[in-house]
């Protein structure tokens, strides 16, 4: 608890065309760079570096690189605030880089390279494209991931975070990229069907059934959730 500081707050206004205006108050998050990874007896196996105070994100990159801890890098909404060297430092040693098509174009421009060259900097990159699905680039291989079909589009806020959560679940389980990407796609689908970023729920059985409806049967899911 940071005495005297309020909790970080984000307010996102979305119109009927899914255009968004975001107002953000960092509050206590501005002190996040003072935190350190727990390395004494609780060393993490994998770290997700997602939008945070930019100084904290840079500090996490250094800690992961110094301690040989693999990490996923997702600058997301902080990409506009970061410069090219900062973004490149985060990308260089990342196990995976994830972002939407707009963010990838911005990162490439700031770093001073093409998007194709950016895919070569990191061995595994994931570009999300909203309703058009996603593209995964892994060591020269390209996987096109279709978008899962939502029952209703209530609010797109939080879809990227949900996609990342599904992707990390499949990635850390060692599943093939086509399956991992589809898990991520379906996870994002649940998020956009609800107002609020964490209001969705599903059971393992429901998830597997809906995966089959969208993409066909996948025996690896039974092993993952078994």
Spell out what each predicted region is.
Residues 14-19, 66, 89-92, 114-117, ...:
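Short, hinge-like loop/turn segments at secondary-structure boundaries
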Residues 1-46, 208-226:
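Conserved N-terminal subdomain of the carbohydrate kinase-like
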Residues 46-116, 124, 132-134:
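Conserved beta-alpha-beta core of the PfkB/ribokinase-like small-molecule kinase fold
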């Amino acid at each position: 608890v940071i005495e005297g500081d309020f909790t970080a707050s984000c307010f996102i206004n979305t119109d009927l065309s899914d255009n968004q205006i975001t107002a953000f108050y960092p509050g206590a998050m501005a002190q996040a760079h003072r935190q350190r990874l727990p390395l004494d007896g609780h060393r993490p196996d994998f770290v997700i570096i997602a939008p945070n105070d930019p100084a904290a994100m840079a500090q996490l990159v250094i800690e992961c690189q110094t301690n040989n801890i693999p990490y996923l890098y997702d600058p997301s909404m902080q990409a506009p605030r970061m410069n090219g060297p900062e973004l490149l430092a985060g990308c260089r040693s990342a196990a995976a880089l994830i972002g939407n098509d707009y963010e990838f174009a911005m990162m490439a421009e700031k770093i001073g390279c093409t998007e194709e060259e950016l895919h070569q900097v990191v061995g595994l990159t994931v570009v999300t494209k909203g309703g058009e699905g996603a593209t995964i680039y892994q060591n020269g291989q390209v996987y096109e991931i279709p978008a899962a079909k939502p029952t209703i589009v209530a609010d797109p806020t939080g879809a990227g975070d949900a996609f990342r959560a599904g992707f990390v679940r499949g990635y850390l389980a060692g599943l093939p990229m086509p399956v991992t990407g589809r898990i991520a796609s379906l996870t994002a689908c649940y998020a956009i069907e609800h107002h609020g970023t964490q209001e969705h729920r599903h059971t393992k059985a429901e998830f597997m059934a809906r995966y089959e409806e969208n993409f066909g049967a996948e025996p690896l899911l039974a092993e993952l959730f078994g």
